């Protein structure tokens, strides 16, 4: 295996592109109907629009049909390894996007981390390896 690319379900692709570019420093490298590819240095994130409301009127037992049902938006998370976590935290903190239960802290598994939530409540955790 070579890499992993998170694919995050979002309710409004344009709003989410703005968030990831304006708040987190990503650059839009590809966009088509309901799908976007964003990059920041070597980190790539895919966004896909989950805005299908048809599930509300389906009569069968399974509401998932297209895989883009609106209730899927905001159900994902990913972790992004960074250098300079303290500086990144100081940059992001005043933006008002930190997860309400997060702070910059050292974890017992030798990582320093914090988390943000996007407009749909997908969880994005940033971490840096630390030496114990």
Curated annotation (Swiss-Prot):
CDD domains: BLMA_like. GO terms for biological process: response to antibiotic. Signal peptide: none annotated. The keyword NAD does not apply. It holds the Pfam family Glyoxalase. The keyword Transcription regulation does not apply. Disulfide bonds: none annotated. Binding protein with a strong affinity to the bleomycin family of antibiotics, which confers resistance to these antibiotics by preventing the bleomycin-induced DNA breakage. This is Bleomycin resistance protein. It comes from Staphylococcus aureus.
């Amino acid at each position: 295996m070579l890499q992993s690319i998170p694919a995050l379900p979002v309710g409004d692709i344009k709003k989410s592109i703005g968030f990831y570019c304006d708040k987190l420093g990503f650059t839009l490298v590809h966009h088509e109907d309901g799908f976007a590819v964003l990059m920041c240095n070597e980190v790539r994130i895919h966004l896909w629009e989950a805005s299908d409301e048809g599930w509300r009127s389906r009569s069968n037992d399974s509401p998932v049909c297209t895989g883009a049902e609106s209730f899927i938006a905001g159900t994902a998370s990913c972790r992004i390894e960074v250098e300079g976590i303290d500086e990144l935290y100081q940059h992001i903190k005043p933006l008002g996007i930190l997860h309400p239960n997060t702070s910059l802290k050292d974890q017992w598994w030798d990582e320093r981390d914090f988390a943000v939530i996007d407009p749909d409540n997908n969880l994005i955790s940033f971490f840096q390896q630390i030496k114990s």
